[in-house]
Amino acid sequence: MPRRKKKGKEASGAQNLEKKDAETASSVSVKKKRRIEDGFIVISDSDGEEPKEENGLQKTKIKQSSRAKCLAKRKIAQMTEEEQFALALKMSEQEAREVNSQEEEEEELLRKAIAESLNSCRPSDASATRSRPLATGPSSESHQEKSTDSGTTEGIWQLVPPSLFKGSHISQGNESEEREEPWDHNENTEEEPVSVSSGSWDQSSQPVFENENVKCFDRCTGHLAEHTQCGKPQNECGRGSAFLKAVQGSGDTSRHCLPTLADAKGLQDTGGTVNYFWGIPFCPDGVDPNQYTKVILCQLEVYQKSLKMAQRQLLNKKGFGEPVLPRPPSLIQNECGQGEQASEKNEGISEDMGDEDKEERQESRASVWRAKTKDFQEGPIKTLKEKLLLEEEPTTSHGQSSQGLFVEETSEEGNSVPASQSIAALTGKRSSVLMPESSAEEITVCPETQLSSPETFDLEKEGFPDSRETLYEVSIMADKEVDNREDAKKEIHTSTFSSSTQVSCPLCDQGFPPTKIERHAMYCNGLMGGDTVLTRRQKEAKNKSDNGIAAQTSLDIDKNEKCYLCKSLVPFREYQCHVESCLQLARVDQGDGPEESGRLCLAVDGKRPQQLKNLKEKDRSEGRLISLLEQSEYKTTDAEIKTKFSETGDFRVPSAGVEEAGCSREMQSSLAHLDLNESPIKSFVSVSEAADCLVDFKKQLTARPGSRTRTKAGRGRRRKS
């Protein structure tokens, strides 16, 4: 019994040894296959398909390398610095050699693969064009052909999808065996003439090339060159050779091997197929071709953007030149001197040179002022009278004609400078009298925006052609000019330039001296009678001053009332009687003439002979005023308006209350044609003047200041809109 057991143990041990030998032989064959596969370039388009055995080998290699690194680190830690340096040099040399050897090996492999692909593509080889002898009879020549062209057949075999086999009842495991069997056959060509596996491979490969499957196979993989031909030569090469030729630089052959998108989709639907990607040159192994193309597109986009940026930097903008000034350089130098003087005064710079310059300027200005005052005292009134009669322009009670307009007219008609100087002096006096001292420093108020005081009204009323030559008027004007010498200096200094040079505003077409055109242009909004635009701080100060002026005018109105017809101030007690007399005079003027109207006016008012002359002139204008009121606003002409205003120089524009009552709508429309700096708020008239109206406004006298503020607010809204 024990002998039998020993025999059974020996038999089982022999079986185990045989199994081990078979396993080792299979492992050796697998290793040899791997070596052969490494020797040839297998071209396949599968994405990331790697056998499991290679992964295992890679893991073992990684473990071994990690162990070696740990040992090397321990050794390096025990070595000195010199030894470490020498070791580093040796390691770098070895790495360089390995890199060079790898490159050389890769080049050799590429050369071999290219040579084999070229040999496989030759249709002249008689042995390559016949695939039947492989199945009919074993021969050493056919096996040698297989061994020489095994690389290309392996590449083509991997490209064939399993679903294309007509009679493919073979499992995927059998397919893998069949793929391995040709390599086993190649190993044993010398020992065994024909193996069973080779016959099975031939039998399984025969249905591939029958009938229509050959065409489909050719569309998917290009075609099968020599090994897979049924007696019909093909001139085109397979896909593997096409790729290798593309590597060499012949990109035209790869176009013949490109499958259509529909074929690729059909292959994907059948299952177990290979995904093909075309059009990406030299895509790295293991990289998604779609992402690789995105990277290429991004690089192109970055290149285009950088090119555009470089082109933009080449463009250089032309620099701005010198500003174009609207005046000659002499005026600029004069203004620069004035600006320096003002800055010295404000900052309080106490320097010797600065004091000398100031004294020289003051002396020069004083000499100019003395010469101008002499000229002014000789004949300012006659020149003013002649100018007003010739020009026939309106002069309102609060100095409506600005300095710029007078200067323009004098330059056109050739009148002398003292006339403009006298007007400048009068306007300077009015602005200084009406504005408070506190707000005079902060804001610059135009004289047109202020109401006239009784003194200036009497002065202008008495300063008409018949009464201007009186000595009383000359003395008043001289006193005012002496009191306001500094203001008059400034006005006369600017008027010396204005007669020769006059700059017109491009927005409102008004003429201004060169020293004032810039300030006007800053605030000009295109309106003919636009006031200077003020800041919030200036508006607040102006509102305060307007409130004080409104209080003063209310006191003045309590004393005197202005007649709307004759534009004269009348005591409040005599106002009603005066208005009735004016109305009677207007009616009589239409029928009998101005002489009877003058008598009635003398009888009712009892004025002095000085007012008789003014009333005669007013009576002439009253007839025209009523005729204008009777006419429609569209039929009035500019000639009638000019004559009317030349004879009645003290007219004011009607107030808002009178306009509501309908007493002067035609008058307002006729005044709209004139380029006057007028508005209802500038020449405010009390409600009691509207005697002919249907509405009784006397009950609303207490609401006068409020109405003034409302109209100002309304004007502000209109300007904003």
Curated annotation (Swiss-Prot):
Residues 349-358 have a biased composition (Acidic residues). The keyword NAD does not apply. Signal peptide: none annotated. It is found in: Nucleus. Disulfide bonds: none annotated. GO terms for biological process: chromatin organization; double-strand break repair; mitotic G2 DNA damage checkpoint signaling; positive regulation of DNA repair; response to ionizing radiation. PANTHER family: BRCA1-A COMPLEX SUBUNIT RAP80, UBIQUITIN INTERACTION MOTIF-CONTAINING PROTEIN 1. GO terms for molecular function: DNA binding; histone binding; K63-linked polyubiquitin modification-dependent protein binding; zinc ion binding. Residues 100-200 are annotated as: Necessary for interaction with NR6A1 N-terminus. Ubiquitin-binding protein. Specifically recognizes and binds 'Lys-63'-linked ubiquitin. Plays a central role in the BRCA1-A complex by specifically binding 'Lys-63'-linked ubiquitinated histones H2A and H2AX at DNA lesions sites, leading to target the BRCA1-BARD1 heterodimer to sites of DNA damage at double-strand breaks (DSBs). The BRCA1-A complex also possesses deubiquitinase activity that specifically removes 'Lys-63'-linked ubiquitin on histones H2A and H2AX. Also weakly binds monoubiquitin but with much less affinity than 'Lys-63'-linked ubiquitin. This is BRCA1-A complex subunit RAP80. Zn(2+) binds at C505, C508, H520, C524. A zinc finger (UBZ4-type) spans 502-529. Belongs to the RAP80 family. Keywords: Chromatin regulator, DNA damage, DNA repair, Isopeptide bond, Metal-binding, Nucleus, Phosphoprotein, Repeat, Transcription, Transcription regulation, Ubl conjugation, Zinc, Zinc-finger. Residues 117-130 have a biased composition (Polar residues). Residues 80-99, 105-124 form the UIM domain. CDD domains: AIR_RAP80-like. GO terms for cellular component: BRCA1-A complex; nucleus. Residues 194-204 have a biased composition (Low complexity). The modification Phosphoserine is found at S29, S44, S46, S101, S140, S205, S402, S420, S467, S627, S655, S679. Component of the ARISC complex, at least composed of UIMC1/RAP80, ABRAXAS1, BRCC3/BRCC36, BABAM2 and BABAM1/NBA1. Component of the BRCA1-A complex, at least composed of the BRCA1, BARD1, UIMC1/RAP80, ABRAXAS1, BRCC3/BRCC36, BABAM2 and BABAM1/NBA1. In the BRCA1-A complex, interacts directly with ABRAXAS1. Interacts with UBE2I. Interacts with NR6A1. Interacts with ESR1. Interacts with TSP57. Interacts with TRAIP. Residues 505-582 are annotated as: Zinc-finger-like region. Sumoylated. There is a cross-link at residues 20, 31, 75, 90, 245, 382, 387, 429, 544, 559, 562, 607, 635, 642, 698-699 (Glycyl lysine isopeptide (Lys-Gly) (interchain with G-Cter in SUMO2)). It comes from Sus scrofa. Residues 1-65, 93-204, 334-369, 391-418 are annotated as: Disordered.
